[in-house]
Amino acid sequence: MHQLTLAEIARGLADKSFSSEELTGALLARIKQLDPQINSFISITDDLALAQARAADARRAAGETGVLLGAPIAHKDLFCTNGVRTSCGSKMLDNFKAPYDATVVAKLAEAGMVTLGKTNMDEFAMGSANESSHYGAVKNPWNLEHVPGGSSGGSAAAVAARLLPATTGTDTGGSIRQPAALTNLTGLKPTYGRVSRWGMIAYASSLDQGGPLARTAEDCALLLQGMAGFDAKDSTSIEEPVPDYSASLNASLQGLRIGLPKEYFGAGLDPRIADLVQASVKELEKLGAVVKEISLPNMQHAIPAYYVIAPAEASSNLSRFDGVRFGYRCEEPKDLTDLYKRSRGEGFGVEVQRRIMVGTYALSAGYYDAYYVKAQQIRRLIKNDFMAAFNDVDLILGPTTPNPAWKLGAKSSDPVAAYLEDVYTITANLAGLPGLSMPAGFVDGLPVGVQLLAPYFQEGRLLNVAHRYQQVTDWHTRAPNGF
């Protein structure tokens, strides 16, 4: 059963080939057997999962037919889950049990999905390798000596290892798309405001967006259907009708205009990845797409702008973790200042402390205009570049990452080298655009992804192109040895 996709599970549950309780029991056993090799879960919620599975079976027996009813899911451990530890991968929240469900968790539970657990992640979603977690690094199922990407590395590794068919993730600078690329999955970052952020512990509030990780575009469409929609509890949520994402999966690509930004193919891109991108372009051309070169002239400024804006927002968001109200508190503080200082110094890991310091510096009186305001101006230029490009093309295509997955620890001592791995993904977050990564081949036995970007609220178009591509290629069907 572990080889089934979400769509196949939906069909199996509908025709009573197996029950949700049987499926849940089998997957929980598989997680306990195999996860110690990859460390993709922080919490496994056996009792909750079996109770939800029995409830889903009862709902189906009573005549309900929802497509996600009884299907399994695991949530990245920054989505609040009522009564279950929500750690954000940090010592700071090691003992925190959320008193409510995040909107995404609530919506999927309402649809009848069964929560198997909470997945490992970079601490407070800050990282591109899933090495900064308080609970230890996650390993890539394709090669256990390599990283799975981050910050949704646990969510990606769990699906890649066939521990379950799909997971939720979040994407602030590529944290769904980059691990999807490095573990041979399909990962979708929706338009900013498409999926509610309520109950999603914030890293950078103007960039964060929740989305699905699965093996196929078809599965991502099913999951996005359950996650998307307006939420009055999230002030950044947008009132935009949610289309039927599955209905447009098979639409023709005839005449679809795809742009290849020349800036994507310069120095820094592994030439073997460039070749795989070109191979995917040829497949899409065979399906009727028209490909042309375009320019995104301000892309070179994206990383410096992002690494001012995101840490600035993080320094503000993470100020709430002070040892007073909830989370980690140091032993026997001398006074209030000592409580703040030691609780935060002991509770936050090195990368989180680094980004808080950078953000606080960028927001300080003497540097605010020079750094933060300038970064926001660059952000506007990047958005304008995309708007101009989408006057000429329907979609933008390129590599998801400049390199395949690197070895564990290889970039730990050089944070900037890790930051540069986000070069192709962060522009979509700065502009708020939807983006998808899909499997496109292998380099040295490690997966490679191709990224598609679309205009606002065109997730259906991204899923359509990825689905048609997956009908004529088999990269997405390949599984790592031993799993």
From Swiss-Prot:
It holds the Pfam family Amidase. It comes from the Bacteria. The active site is at 76 (charge relay system), 151 (charge relay system), 175 (acyl-ester intermediate). It is an enzyme of class 6 (ligase). It catalyses: L-glutamyl-tRNA(Gln) + L-glutamine + ATP + H2O = L-glutaminyl-tRNA(Gln) + L-glutamate + ADP + phosphate + H(+). Its EC number is 6.3.5.7. GO terms for biological process: translation. GO terms for molecular function: ATP binding; glutaminyl-tRNA synthase (glutamine-hydrolyzing) activity. InterPro entries: Amidase, Amidase_CS, Amidase_dom, AS_sf, GatA. GO terms for cellular component: glutamyl-tRNA(Gln) amidotransferase complex. Keywords: ATP-binding, Ligase, Nucleotide-binding, Protein biosynthesis. Allows the formation of correctly charged Gln-tRNA(Gln) through the transamidation of misacylated Glu-tRNA(Gln) in organisms which lack glutaminyl-tRNA synthetase. The reaction takes place in the presence of glutamine and ATP through an activated gamma-phospho-Glu-tRNA(Gln). Heterotrimer of A, B and C subunits. Belongs to the amidase family. GatA subfamily. This is Glutamyl-tRNA(Gln) amidotransferase subunit A. It comes from Pseudomonas putida (strain ATCC 700007 / DSM 6899 / JCM 31910 / BCRC 17059 / LMG 24140 / F1). The lineage of its organism: Bacteria, Pseudomonadati, Pseudomonadota, Gammaproteobacteria, Pseudomonadales.
